[in-house]
C-alpha cells in the first residue's frame, strides 16, 4: 500500500501487509514513512487499522517492532495496541541478534473502543 498526502497527493510512505483469509489475521510486515515527525506515520497506522477491521474480515492485526524503535512503540501503544510479548534474539542483523516485540489489536478491542483514533 502507498500512502499519499491528502492535499498534495505526494507519496509519503508505504506499507507491506499480509492478510491470511483463512485465519483472519492482518499482518503489517513493514511500514516506512518518508517525512518523519509530521504525523504521517500515525495517520497511516490509523488508516491501516480502520481498513483491517472495517473493510476485511480481520480478527487480529499484528506487527513486530525492534526494541530500539521507541517512537514506533509509543505510536502503537497510543493507538490501543497490546504488547503480546518479545521474541528474544529472533532476527540476525549486521549488529547481531535482535529481539522483536509483538504488538496486536483484536476486532473485539477495536469494537469496544480500545482503539484510540
Task: Locate the predicted segments by residue.
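Short glycine/proline-centered loop/turn elements that form peptide/ligand docking sites
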Residues: 41, 45, 68-72, 89-94
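Conserved acetyl-CoA-binding loop-helix of GNAT-fold acetyltransferases
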Residues: 33, 38-52, 73-78
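Terminal substrate-recognition subdomain of acyl/acetyltransferases
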Residues: 96-117
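Acetyl-CoA-dependent GNAT
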Residues: 1-36, 51, 55-56, 106-110
Amino acid at each position: 500500500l502507498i500512502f499519499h498526502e491528502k492535499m498534495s497527493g505526494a507519496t509519503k510512505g508505504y506499507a507491506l501487509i499480509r492478510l491470511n483469509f483463512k485465519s483472519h489475521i492482518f499482518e503489517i510486515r513493514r511500514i516506512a514513512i518518508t517525512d518523519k515527525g509530521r504525523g504521517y506515520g500515525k495517520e497511516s497506522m490509523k488508516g491501516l487499522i480502520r481498513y483491517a477491521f472495517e473493510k476485511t474480515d480481520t480478527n487480529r492485526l499484528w506487527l513486530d517492532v525492534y526494541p530500539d524503535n521507541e517512537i514506533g512503540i509509543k505510536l502503537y501503544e497510543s493507538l490501543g495496541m497490546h504488547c503480546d510479548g518479545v521474541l528474544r534474539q529472533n532476527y540476525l542483523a549486521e549488529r547481531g541478534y535482535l529481539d522483536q516485540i509483538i504488538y496486536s489489536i483484536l476486532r473485539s478491542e477495536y469494537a469496544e473502543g480500545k482503539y484510540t483514533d
